[in-house]
Design a protein with these regions (language model features):
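Flexible, surface-exposed loop/linker segments and immediately adjacent secondary-structure boundaries
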Residues: 85-122
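A short, Trp-centered hydrophobic/proline-enriched beta-strand micro-motif
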Residues: 21-41
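Positively charged n-region of N-terminal signal peptides that target proteins for export
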Residues: 1-3
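Hydrophobic h-region of N-terminal signal peptides that target proteins for export
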Residues: 5-14
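Short, solvent-exposed coil/turn segments at beta-strand boundaries
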Residues: 25-26, 50-57, 72-76, 117-119, ...
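Gly/Pro-enriched, hydrophobic low-complexity segments
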Residues: 115-163
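An acidic-aromatic
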Residues: 53-98, 148-153
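Amphipathic hydrophobic-ligand
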Residues: 42-49, 69-72
Length: 163
């Protein structure tokens, strides 16, 4: 009975964590993305906003250092590079990882390689890439990962006061 209780308790914790993650990404968010620039040994930062409309489409605005807008829908990502007046589209099947798809469609415990580290930290592994999530507070979520160029990235999402 003790082992069954522990298994049930672990499933309950991971379900609650997944649900908290899904609920978090329903909010309007501000974010800071930090990555290490290996060419000049410095940290590069991008600042922006994340929002979701009533049709579950996502809009990501990069405000600095470059002005870009990403529209994510069921077909893929439309990218507007405002400073260069360029627009391009990437189909869902051409997106190299599923993290954006998870954020758009929701994280589901049964489809994830999910590891609970503690009450506030967990790891999702997808195609041999690790994504580390940590709830810093109810209003702040941090994601750490290596990108497709094997550079360390850190994104801090914070809830905006308006929902």
């Amino acid at each position: 009975i003790y082992i069954i209780f522990l298994l049930f308790f672990n499933l309950l914790i991971s379900d609650n964590t997944i649900e908290s993650l899904n609920e978090f990404f329903k909010n309007n968010l501000e974010f800071v993305q930090t990555s290490f620039n290996t060419i000049n040994n410095s940290f590069d930062k991008s600042y922006g906003n994340f929002s979701r409309d009533l049709n579950n489409n996502i809009k990501i605005e990069i405000n600095s250092p470059f002005k870009e807008i990403y529209f994510i829908n069921e077909d893929g990502i439309e990218i507007h590079e405002l400073e260069f007046n360029q627009k391009r589209f990437i189909k869902n099947q051409d997106i190299p990882n599923n993290i954006l798809k998870f954020i758009k469609n929701g994280f589901r415990n049964e489809s994830l390689d999910f590891e609970q580290i503690d009450d506030f930290k967990f790891k999702i592994t997808e195609f041999e890439k690790n994504y580390y999530f940590e709830f810093i507070s109810n209003d702040t979520l941090q994601i750490k990962y290596k990108d497709n160029m094997n550079l360390d990235n850190l994104i801090n999402f914070s809830k905006q006061n308006d929902k």
